[in-house]
Amino acid sequence: MMGLAKTLLLASQLTAVVVATPTINNDNELTTKWPVCVKPTKVLDERIPTVKRGPVETPLPTQPGMVNNCNKFCWVQAGNKCYQVAMENHISLADFLKWNPGAGSDCRTLWANTYACVGVSKK
């Protein structure tokens, strides 16, 4: 059984999560496909961080080594493989590996939870 102090602490932490997470509706249900804030920051910003890299802004984070002329990006989820990402974006595996050399020639070093390049502009 939890003591009163622990119960109050847990309640205050849960309230902070609900306040900082606008994807929780009035019935305290999470809206699907939206991130949940578990530790609020000083600035709550919904924009995806980007960096200017060539002709377009590149969303962050990315795996090191991505080509500079990338103009189309795909979020790599845990469990994704290079071939799967390439096929879903209608590009060849060879192009995917050329544009994302950090994934390795055998795709063993593809990072999850990063953006990968799935399209390039002509240099």
Curated annotation (Swiss-Prot):
Residues 1-20 form the signal peptide. It comes from the Eukaryota. Induction: Expressed constitutively with no significant difference during colonization of banana roots. GO terms for molecular function: chitin binding. Residues 72-118 form the LysM domain. Coiled coil: none annotated. Keywords: Chitin-binding, Signal, Virulence. Might have a role in sequestration of chitin oligosaccharides (breakdown products of fungal cell walls that are released during invasion and act as triggers of host immunity) to dampen host defense. The LysM (lysin motif) domains are small globular domains involved in binding chitin in eukaryotes. Lys1 contains one LysM domain. Belongs to the secreted LysM effector family. In plants, chitin acts as a microbe-associated molecular pattern (MAMP) that is recognized by lysin motif (LysM)-containing plant cell surface-localized pattern recognition receptors (PRRs) that activate a plethora of downstream immune responses. This is Secreted LysM effector Lys1. It comes from Pochonia chlamydosporia (strain 123). The lineage of its organism: Eukaryota, Fungi, Dikarya, Ascomycota, Pezizomycotina. The gene is Lys1.
